[in-house]
């Protein structure tokens, strides 16, 4: 079956309609002709000639004027049309063919399309209701389906009411036809749009068939359907605009451009946008990350502050190891290896050889005699340490290869006599210095003396070791917390005096000098005098020491109980000598005098 196209001009449309009716009457049966004649006589009504022609045109070409594809047999005047070109634009109705003065009613229109019901059903089976080849949004397709269902229901209801007769003339197409600017002129000829533009309007073209059937329904159904069609056309506007832009810009690739336009339409769909919770997800993650980092910093700062407070507490607290005895072998090894072993000075080869041989100046050497005469005469030309050293040498009778142990800290460090005794009498000396600055000074001064040992420690006033903080008032550093200066405090380990003697592997000493700022008596009380042997004990007090007389009296009483006697006082330096040693030395001198002639 070919598609017949009618002109919009009434005269031409009448001629074409008459030719189509003749061919149709020749091929149809007599039964159809009788029924058509009966129905035409039944609906005959007096009307003007002009309106009759228009009515005949409208009745005969109702299928084509309403925008649907009328299928008729091919004829010489109306050649057959290929299947590819079946989609055409709806033929425009000429408003000039209708007389506005005449009163037109739908009941007066002759039914000239009798017998077209079977053809319309056959066309509906061949032509799909909706072409979904082009992507559209879901809500547009759903609205189109609802419209088609409503139109089909209204059309079927109208056919049942008419009893299977033909359709009425398409009067509704005249009422809802396009604007005057789109109406063709009387001399216009039917034209066909290009294939690209036919694809743009496929949605509206395929829906015109259903709309034409819906217009044949009663007027109470026709008006709501027309409003719904206008809304549908408004919703399709954006889709047609994107499709037209794709076809115009892409040419042959109109399908791909239409696909990109549909993708843009999907992006504009509010249902496809991310939910509010998903949009807030990056912000929530950012806040959580910031909170985690901030919490980590707070924990780190608190931990650092706690550690710093613990460190300051450790630096200010004294630890007493009262469970460790002063003659513990582990304690002695610790003191010997840690505090004494790595601080041994390297003497020159000559000094080391002399120390190993034990050679020193003779007792009656002129140098020693000069030193003794100088000290005895009270000449103050020498230093205080040299004067004290000469007096000690006089007390011991100029003994060679003796031993001295001294602990004079702070302001009393200038009274140390061990270096002089080591050089003049080849004595072995042990210097105990707790303050770091004076310790490094003494170590530098005695670096070339092989028999001098400097120990970085303090003498404990108890019989067990301990660790204390030394407050050095003459050393200042910048504070780490504020701009003010703070006193530098150092930590030092204190060992009992007897432990230091055992670490030096010697318990017999010729001289013991103590100047520890008021702790001399406590240190002397820790010594086991039954296990050690000390000839001379010197006590050195500070000038600002309070109650010097009472303190010296207490020391004198304690040493008197240990067989020591105060021999001489030089300033605030007190010298005590063991009585047994002095008596034995006097006895030796008397024996020598008796043997001489």
From Swiss-Prot:
GO terms for cellular component: endoplasmic reticulum; endoplasmic reticulum membrane; Golgi apparatus; Golgi membrane; late endosome membrane; perinuclear endoplasmic reticulum; plasma membrane. It is found in: Endoplasmic reticulum membrane; Golgi apparatus membrane; Cell membrane. Interacts with Spitz via the lumenal domain and mediates its transport to the Golgi. This is Protein Star. Involved in EGF receptor signaling. Has an early role in photoreceptor development. Interacts with the receptor torpedo in the eye. The keyword Membrane applies. It is a single-pass type II membrane protein. Residues 168-193 have a biased composition (Low complexity). Residues 27-39, 65-80, 196-218 have a biased composition (Polar residues). Signal peptide: none annotated. The chain crosses the membrane at residues 280-300. In the larval eye disk, expression is first seen at the morphogenetic furrow, then in the developing R2, R5, and R8 cells as well as in the posterior clusters of the disk in additional R cells. Pfam families: Methyltransf_21. It comes from Drosophila melanogaster (Fruit fly). Keywords: Cell membrane, Developmental protein, Endoplasmic reticulum, Golgi apparatus, Membrane, Sensory transduction, Signal-anchor, Transmembrane, Transmembrane helix, Vision. Residues 301-597 are lumenal. Residues 223-242 have a biased composition (Basic residues). Residues 1-279 are cytoplasmic. InterPro entries: EGF_Rcpt_Signaling_Reg, FkbM_mtfrase, SAM-dependent_MTases_sf. PANTHER family: PROTEIN STAR. Residues 247-261 have a biased composition (Gly residues). Residues 1-85, 111-267 are annotated as: Disordered. Its main location: endoplasmic reticulum.
């Amino acid at each position: 079956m070919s598609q017949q196209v009618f002109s919009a001009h009434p005269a031409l449309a009448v001629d074409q309609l008459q030719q189509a009716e003749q061919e149709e009457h020749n091929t149809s049966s007599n039964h159809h002709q009788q029924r058509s004649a009966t129905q035409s006589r039944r609906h005959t009504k007096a009307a003007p000639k002009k309106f009759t022609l228009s009515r005949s045109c409208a009745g005969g070409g109702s299928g084509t004027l309403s925008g649907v594809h009328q299928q008729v047999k091919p004829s010489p005047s109306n050649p057959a049309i290929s299947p590819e070109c079946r989609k055409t634009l709806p033929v425009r109705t000429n408003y000039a063919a209708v007389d506005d003065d005449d009163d037109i009613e739908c009941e007066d229109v002759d039914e000239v399309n009798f017998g077209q019901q079977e053809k319309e059903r056959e066309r509906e089976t061949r032509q799909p209701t909706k072409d979904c080849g082009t992507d559209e949004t879901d809500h547009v397709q759903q609205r189109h389906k609802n419209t088609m269902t409503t139109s089909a229901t209204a059309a079927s209801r109208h056919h049942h009411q008419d009893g299977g007769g033909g359709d009425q003339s398409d009067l509704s197409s005249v009422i809802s036809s396009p604007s005057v600017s789109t109406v063709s002129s009387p001399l216009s000829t039917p034209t066909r749009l290009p294939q690209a533009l036919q694809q743009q309007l496929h949605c509206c073209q395929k829906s015109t068939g259903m709309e034409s059937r819906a217009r044949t329904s009663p007027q109470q159904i026709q008006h709501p359907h027309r409003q719904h069609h206008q809304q549908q056309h408004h919703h399709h506007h954006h889709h047609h605009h994107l499709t037209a832009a794709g076809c115009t810009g892409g040419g042959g690739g109109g399908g791909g451009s239409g696909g990109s336009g549909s993708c843009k339409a999907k992006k504009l769909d509010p249902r496809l946008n991310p939910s509010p919770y998903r949009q807030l997800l990056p912000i929530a993650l950012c806040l959580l990350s910031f909170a985690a980092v901030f919490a980590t910093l707070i924990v780190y700062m608190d931990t650092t502050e706690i550690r710093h407070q613990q460190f300051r507490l450790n630096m200010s607290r004294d630890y007493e190891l009262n469970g460790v005895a002063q003659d513990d072998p582990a304690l002695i090894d610790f003191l010997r290896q840690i505090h004494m072993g790595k601080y041994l000075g390297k003497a020159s080869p000559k000094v080391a050889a002399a120390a190993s041989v034990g050679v020193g100046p003779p007792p009656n050497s002129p140098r020693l005699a000069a030193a003794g005469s100088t000290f005895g005469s009270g000449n103050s030309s020498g230093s205080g340490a040299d004067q004290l050293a000469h007096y000690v040498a006089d007390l011991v009778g100029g003994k060679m290869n003796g031993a001295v142990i001294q602990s004079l800290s702070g302001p009393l460090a200038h009274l140390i006599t061990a270096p002089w005794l080591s050089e003049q009498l080849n004595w072995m000396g042990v210097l105990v210095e707790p303050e770091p600055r004076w310790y490094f000074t003494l170590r530098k001064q005695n670096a070339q003396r092989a028999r001098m040992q400097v120990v970085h420690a303090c003498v404990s006033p108890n019989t067990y070791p301990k660790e204390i903080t030394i407050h050095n008032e003459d050393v200042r550093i910048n504070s780490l917390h504020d701009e003010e200066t703070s006193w530098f405090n150092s930590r030092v380990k204190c060992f009992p005096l007897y432990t230091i003697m055992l670490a030096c592997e010697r318990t017999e000493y010729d001289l013991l000098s103590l100047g520890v700022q008021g702790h001399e008596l406590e240190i002397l009380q820790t010594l086991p005098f039954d296990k050690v042997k000390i000839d001379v004990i010197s006590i050195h007090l500070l000038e600002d020491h309070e109650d010097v007389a009472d303190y010296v009296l207490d020391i004198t009483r304690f040493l008197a109980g240990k067989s020591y006697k105060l021999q001489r006082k030089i300033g605030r330096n007190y010298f005590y000598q063991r009585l047994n040693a002095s008596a034995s030395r006097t006895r030796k001198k008397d024996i020598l005098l008796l043997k001489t002639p």
